[in-house]
Amino acid sequence: MLRALYTLAIALFVLSPAAFAKTKTYIYAASSLTGTITKAARDFNAKTGLSVIPVFGASSTLARQIIQGAPANLFISANKLWMDKVSQHQLIVSGSRLDLTANQLILIAPKSSNIAVSLSDTKNLTSVLSGNRIAIADPNHVPAGLYAKKALQTLKIWPHIKNHLAMAANVRIALSYVERGEVPFGIVYKSDNVGRTNIKTITHAPACRSCP
């Protein structure tokens, strides 16, 4: 199965060690990292007595907030383009940026679903989506949505899907649409489905060679 790996980037904002100990530290992170970052921050706060506060959202939304003056000390973006935009405003400490980890896109459905779908069978897909929608993060600016669109274009099925989208403000909201049964399918990150008992993975997305 071809894999779609998407690199995260990290940037540190000016904060001296003394200030770190006395103030709240804000981590602005892509919504796909909600579970991981929330647990890490909770454990860190409990062990140190410090106050690390995670703020989650679409990387595009977070980047805009940072550019507009939001008090971010750490930014973890789901793609490099939005990190570049923050960098262009000279808001990143020199030398602090690095590729941190990777993720993978998957097609999901409710655990109870009996609908069979194939991303490689246009006729099957058109039939399944008749009167239905597929949840993805907004492909106009959210990294998960941009990657999903690229993957669907690679499969040459974007023209058959683009009018059947339930677009979400971020990938976690797209996941919630499927969890609540509002849509039969969704495209999210593999990390979003970790520990979910009511969602199943149908297939993995193809690799996106040109994704930033």
Label every model-predicted segment.
Residues 76:
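Short active-site segment of divalent metal-dependent hydrolases/proteases
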Residues 20-70, 79-80, 84-89, 93-103, ...:
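Exported/periplasmic ABC-transporter solute-binding proteins
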Residues 1-2:
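N-terminal secretory signal peptides that target proteins for export/translocation
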Residues 5-16:
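Bacterial N-terminal signal peptides
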